[in-house]
Swiss-Prot record:
Any GO molecular function: protein serine kinase activity
Alphabetized Pfam families for the sequence: Pkinase
Name by which UniProt lists this protein: Probable serine/threonine protein kinase IRE4
Modified residues (Phosphoserine): S854
Ranges of compositional bias, category Basic and acidic residues: 1-10, 102-115, 314-327
Limits of the Protein kinase domain: 670-955
Species of the source: Arabidopsis thaliana
Amino acid sequence: MAEENRKDRGVSSTVAIPSGLNRIKTRLASSGPRPEDSSDTVLKPPFNRNQKTIVPRGHGRTTGSSKQERKGTKLSRWLASYKPKYSCHPPKYACSSTTSSEEIKLRGKNSGKDEEKMIKISETNPPCSKSMGIKSFSHELGPRGGVQTPYPRPHSYNDLKELLGSLHSRFDVAKETVDKKLDVFVRDVKEAMEKMDPSCPEDREMAEQLLDVARACMEMTSAQLRATCESIVQDLTRKRKQCQAGLVKWLFSQLLFILTHCTRVVMFQKETEPIDESSFRKFKECLERIPALETDWGSTPRVDDSGSGYPEYQRNEAGQKFKRRDKESLESETALDYVVPNDHGNNAAREGYAAAKQEFPSHEPQFDSKVVEQRFYLSDEYEDKMSNEPGKELGGSDYVICRICEEEVPLFHLEPHSYICAYADKCEINCVDVDERLLKLEEILEQIIDSRSLNSFTQAGGLENSVLRKSGVASEGCSPKINEWRNKGLEGMFEDLHEMDTAFIDESYTYPIHLKSHVGAKFCHHATSSSTGSITSVSSTNTPRTSHFDSYWLERHCPEQEDLRLMMDLSDIARCGASTDFSKEGSCDYIMACMQDIQAVLKQGKLKALVIDTFGGRIEKLLCEKYLHARELTADKSSVGNIKESEDVLEHASATPQLLLKDRISIDDFEIIKPISRGAFGKVFLARKRTTGDFFAIKVLKKLDMIRKNDIERILQERNILITVRYPFLVRFFYSFTCRDNLYLVMEYLNGGDLYSLLQKVGCLDEEIARIYIAELVLALEYLHSLKIVHRDLKPDNLLIAYNGHIKLTDFGLSKIGLINNTIDLSGHESDVSPRTNSHHFQKNQEEERIRHSAVGTPDYLAPEILLGTEHGYAADWWSAGIVLFELLTGIPPFTASRPEKIFDNILNGKMPWPDVPGEMSYEAQDLINRLLVHEPEKRLGANGAAEVKSHPFFQGVDWENLALQKAAFVPQPESINDTSYFVSRFSESSCSDTETGNNSGSNPDSGDEVGIWKLHPFLSRYSICNHRIYRKLFFLLLCVF
């Protein structure tokens, strides 16, 4: 009995399901012998329309039963060799199968003559087999690796002709595959026609029409089939609906399944512009907007500057100087009262800017010695002032790392600096050009000055008039609403700002904290989670609103400590630097004078890490970048005499909070720890940022895959939208960057697994728990659709469980890549393992084949319009939501089967194995699923918006406004910070080695590789095992009956 319990998917092992799951129901599939798996799979047409057949989960919901598998540790599963998803040649149309006499006898009770005909048709297919390829994990991250695809693939996206040839050849390869399948289909139809009953001439006539269509498609060229395949599929779909259940309708489904391979390719290519040299150049321009740095997988945290684009002499001359820190600026010195600069110095800056604007047009500025001399004069005056200043006031020695600028900040300035830095970062988040970023910083400085002036926070009598005069420069649309300022306090300030916590930061990165505020309290415990349920520190991207900043500035900031005139000087310098055209003569000298001015302003600042220091450092960094660019593009001989002085300026600029050469993030800034999961279109790795110690999840995608799909512009457009938003049920994006071959997306790290992993263990969920999960999914889809984004690839794998137990939807910006893999390659993922003498080994190998190909070949969650290759919209997501709800309640998708073409036929027929209603499912849940799974998209629930879904009786009692604040039924309890054992990937199940590895310390040798990661309450464990046995017996009984 104990051995039997261990075989039942390892449910006897400890697992981590909370006691909040009141009624645990388990999945209907098991790893034991089944009547269906005792022999080869034989496809048969559906004859009884009301037949309810519960099919075992055929794509990865099962674990191995061997004893060696149970001894592997969590980490060894990933370090061991695994089988890649494309480790074999494209399979043929079908594989041979030998049906046992007992099974045929049982099926004969409920089948007619048509069934025997279809069995003989299936037996005509030749046998085939696949080799189980092995690929080392060490090649996962490299630019090379993977298995060759059946179509020509370019070696680099820079080779335009080779790339375009690869793009155009995709449909040609699809045509060749379809022709082979059509040839087999024609032979099968001929054999079926010979045995048809002569008393049914209608069936014979329809079969002849199918023969004519198949032959015509085979005779067409690739161009002709591309132009006519959509109309052919639409006509076949219409005729199929008119057929009655039987052999002819099954033949219609088979032909549709073959031809939709072409229509899906056409659909994805039609949604974008034709692939030619012009569109490819547009793509390259779009891709170049993402910063590209060469990848270096070494352990050194140094950034590889080989791809910076600057000449060698400039990197040696200036680049190395930016890596040295001015430690004197971090030392604590005695503070004296600040002497306000006289009006002459302040007016000099404005006169210099006015002279440049008046004498030379702004769109084509030029510079002469007077303007440059004016800038140097201002710098000399600042230097004279600084000679009488002892230094900056730091007031303490404790420092912490800001999660935004990643620089050390005095502890007592952490709260205001975090807000100011986030606000400054907002100025540059959507700006690419240096001049645009300078103008944005200048605009925000003007708003700060306006808020100070309008509330009488001035230090000079005539300052207010000058500020009011300048206020017209700022953008009117970005001006704050004065009436809202006083209505918002400190809590309102942080409404849109990330919490300043160091959730799950390594101890080596934490600092002693003595701050007695809300922010300081968060820092005191390094394992405090964020309010969003993420382990990733969430203080690095979200930024406050304009009115929030002014409210905080007026109510919380100490105005006497920040000099208003220095802010005005920073604004002038940023404006002058942005108006400089470095293609004109004298631009280098002028920018260098601006850099000297800003360095003088920074030296006069009394407080570190506040407005002057934060904005000034960012402006200085941008000016340095512009200066180096100007030196690269211009050969101004007049600047040769100032080389020594410019070197001093560049060397001093290295003390700014932002280093110039480190402005753009790359993969070298992260330490790759281990893989988390593998998906249909990318791999996800757990990584730690070297500077802060924060954990992130990095998704790695191949550039060529995106180019091959010809959908890069939409992907980048969705990414640009989602990277700036924050929603409690969507996974956050933090960074995106590229190397030569890959695109990297850095997302928040959620170590609670996903709904697929949860269902993998518990089988199915109570309706109350499923209602909350689906309600959160509805809100996520509602938000995505408001951004004009269709997910298209919704499934339990993409619903991650956050640290607080709530779900977060992922892959929404890149789901179309996975969708293409899921739909185009459906027909190539068939179980074609040759029969073995040992039925147990054959059943195990057959199951492994289905698991290995499931993630890229299952159409379980796809809407009919996507499978048929027709136009689709938001309604496709609501279809998938209905599939997910059915799976949460029953444990299996409604249309699942052992082969993709059978799933395809089930979806078109709408045949579902409903559980007992209302015993196992309520009437409200059944009605919601029925209305979501309507074949016509315009009639589907949700076609007119999410409001009609939210108003369904199934969601009665759901508090939509406070759903994210409710306590979740299942809250993950990871063993450590970097514990990824809650993830059970569809790929990882077939990728792990069957042999025990040597690294198994700290784990139970008797626990299964997936099962041992959950900790289940003893009562729930016993209940789950008992329930599992009941469902397994019921499952076998249903198989025998039907």
